[in-house]
């Protein structure tokens, strides 16, 4: 008895039964039912049971007695109707899960129309990925996958780079355009341009100003610009090179301005340490000095020039003025008399100290001289060194002979008052005025004060002009004064020239101070 009003040719009794039974009994009963259909169906029975619904498999259970289970219908209903179609369908449906592909083609034709979509779940890959016909990776379409940069794609990028050598930084829109043309991603395009700029920079072919103004990028840019300038002139037309002249000039101006930013103080010399401006002013100053027609004065000025240039600095300007005044007084003061040939030799002896001692003294002393340090150093040097290295007037105590000789000079000379005013004028230009404390520290004797030195200078000048009774009165004292200098300066003056020796003694340069000493 069937129920055609439901649209199904089987009864509803097994449906209620299968709703109460478990899935394991369905699989076992299905396996026994399909055992006579072939050896292949028994192995596939546990596989297709979870796929189909349990109410469809319940009609294949012929050994179940529906009347005994429900007590409503008689026994003939469960066994009289064979339902052979469903039994044969169960054996044919197992072909969907067999390993043989030919069986699946044969069995698919006899399948039920309502069960055909279920077979799509057992393709070799998932049905959700079946819409991608190119590959079976599951998460990425081949159209969106990255593509390796080939020669055709990089040729487009190289052409763009060649056109924009002055500014090889593509904008966002240009990157998108190039990515569409070359079928690359934006990241690949940006990476390619970054690598191309780095490669050109390593090869010193940069023709663009760097965006970050670093010191290490300026030098390759400058060198590469010169190299590229030579290549472009040989490569391009004159018209194109004339058009490119203006941006290159602007870049050079920017480069000069940017070079001022990283001014290295270690490489550049400070202006205070430069020796050239004092050296040139010294040359110009000494050439204007009216010198004697003899040659030793010019040689002495050259020696002074060399010594001051070797040890000097900006602090020597005042000393140069004083040296010029000394040279003027020495050159213009004593006239070249036939009996007194000590004029040029006096200057030569006075300046002979400069190359030997003044350069060492100037190098040893600091730029701004400390009066206390200079006084103590001069006092220590005067006591430690021998008397042959210093003039006798520079020592602390010479004994009674030298002061007596110097003090007797104003009393015995009636012509002292005439040149004394000129000596006072020259005294204002002497370095003794600037080093008053230093001289006071060295000369402890009250006789050797500045007034006495001025009188001694005037006396010596008078002795040069008139070698008569004054020279004879100064004979013993002059011999005492010139005795140490005879050993210090062997070729300067013979021993029998007391007046010239006294003048040279007073004009001698002290070695410890390193300054031109002119009283």
UniProtKB/Swiss-Prot annotation:
Residue stretches of biased makeup (Basic and acidic residues): 213-222
Subcellular localization, as worded in the UniProt entry: Nucleus
InterPro entries on file: HD, Homeobox_CS, Homeodomain-like_sf, Iroquois_homeo, KN_HD
Composition skew (Acidic residues), residue ranges: 223-235, 257-267
Keywords assigned by UniProt, alphabetized: DNA-binding, Homeobox, Nucleus
Broad class of the protein's primary localization: nucleus
Protein name as annotated: Iroquois-class homeodomain protein IRX-4
């Amino acid at each position: 008895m069937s129920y055609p009003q439901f649209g199904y040719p089987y009864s509803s009794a097994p449906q209620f039964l299968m709703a109460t039974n478990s899935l394991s009994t369905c699989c076992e009963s299905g396996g026994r039912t399909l055992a006579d259909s072939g050896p292949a169906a028994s192995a596939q029975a546990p596989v297709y049971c979870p796929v189909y619904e349990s109410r469809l498999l319940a009609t294949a259970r012929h050994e179940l007695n529906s009347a005994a289970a429900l007590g409503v219908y008689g026994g003939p209903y469960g066994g009289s109707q064979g339902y052979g179609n469903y039994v044969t369908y169960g054996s044919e449906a197992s072909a969907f899960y067999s390993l043989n592909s030919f069986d699946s083609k044969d069995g698919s034709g006899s399948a039920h129309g309502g069960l055909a979509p279920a077979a799509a779940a057992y393709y070799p890959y998932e049905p959700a990925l079946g819409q991608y016909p190119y590959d079976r990776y599951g998460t990425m379409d081949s159209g969106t996958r990255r593509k390796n940069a080939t020669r055709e794609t990089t040729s487009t990028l190289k052409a763009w780079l060649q056109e924009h050598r002055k500014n090889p930084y593509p904008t966002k829109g240009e990157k998108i355009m190039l990515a569409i043309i070359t079928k690359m991603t934006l990241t690949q395009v940006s990476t390619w341009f970054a690598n191309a700029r780095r490669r050109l920079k390593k090869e010193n072919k940069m023709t663009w100003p760097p965006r970050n103004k670093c010191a290490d990028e300026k030098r390759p840019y400058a060198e590469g610009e010169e190299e590229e300038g030579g290549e472009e002139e040989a490569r391009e037309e004159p018209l194109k090179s004339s058009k490119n002249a203006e941006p290159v000039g602007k870049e050079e101006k920017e480069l000069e301005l940017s070079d001022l930013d990283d001014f290295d103080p270690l490489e550049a010399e400070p202006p205070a340490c430069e020796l050239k401006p004092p050296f040139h002013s010294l040359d110009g100053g000494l050439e204007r000095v009216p010198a004697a027609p003899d040659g030793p004065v010019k040689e002495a000025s050259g020696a002074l020039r060399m010594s001051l240039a070797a040890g000097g600095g900006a602090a020597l300007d005042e000393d140069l003025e004083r040296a010029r005044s000394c040279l003027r007084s020495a050159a213009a003061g004593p006239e070249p008399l036939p009996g007194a040939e000590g004029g040029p030799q006096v200057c030569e002896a006075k300046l002979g100290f400069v190359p030997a001692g003044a350069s060492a003294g100037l190098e040893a002393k600091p730029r701004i001289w400390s009066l206390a340090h200079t006084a103590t150093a001069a006092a220590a040097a005067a006591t430690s060194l021998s008397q042959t290295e210093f003039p006798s007037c520079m020592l602390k105590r010479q004994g009674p002979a030298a002061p007596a000789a110097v003090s007797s000079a104003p009393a015995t000379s009636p012509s002292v008052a005439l040149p004394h005013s000129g000596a006072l004028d020259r005294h204002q230009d002497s370095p003794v005025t600037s080093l008053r404390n230093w001289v006071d520290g060295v000369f402890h004797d009250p006789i050797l004060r500045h007034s006495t030195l001025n009188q001694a200078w005037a006396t010596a000048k008078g002795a040069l002009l008139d070698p008569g009774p004054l020279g004879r009165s100064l004979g013993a004292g002059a011999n005492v004064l010139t005795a140490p200098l005879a050993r210090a300066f062997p070729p300067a003056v013979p021993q029998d020239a007391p007046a010239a020796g006294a003048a040279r003694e007073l004009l001698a340069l002290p070695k410890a101070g390193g300054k031109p000493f002119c009283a």
